[in-house]
């Protein structure tokens, strides 16, 4: 296992909610990342982020590790939830907040 994969695994394990995105929550660099961050932020939970534009090694390796080719990628409690379309679908159904609130139960 290479060092980048180990780094990704550590990030996912050490952050109950993490999004790999283009840009930052305050300044997303693509529309998909902006939409995903808006939906996640609306749930009222703190989350970590990794800007894949500033981390080209992660941008290259994460799609292979996750078996998910695009960004953003939302991970909750070590599991890949999905990209922008899935995040928005869960948000519109009211399920994203439930998915994210599981972190409170598991970490209490």
From Swiss-Prot:
Ranges for domain Glutaredoxin come to 5-107
Q: Which UniProt keywords apply?
A: 2Fe-2S, Cytoplasm, Iron, Iron-sulfur, Metal-binding, Redox-active center
Q: Give GO cellular component annotations, separated by semicolons.
A: cytoplasm
Q: Which CDD domains match?
A: GRX_PICOT_like
Positions of [2Fe-2S] cluster binding:
30
Q: Summarize where glutathione binds, as residue positions.
A: 22, 59, 71, 84-85
**Example GO molecular function:** metal ion binding
- Record-linked InterPro entries: Glutaredoxin, GRX_PICOT-like, Monothiol_GRX, Monothiol_GRX-rel, Thioredoxin-like_sf
Give compartment(s). Cytoplasm
| Subunit comment | Homodimer.
Q: Which family does it belong to?
A: Belongs to the glutaredoxin family. Monothiol subfamily.
Function in brief: Monothiol glutaredoxin involved in the biogenesis of iron-sulfur clusters.
What is this protein's record name?
Glutaredoxin 4
Species whose genome carries this gene: Buchnera aphidicola subsp. Baizongia pistaciae (strain Bp)
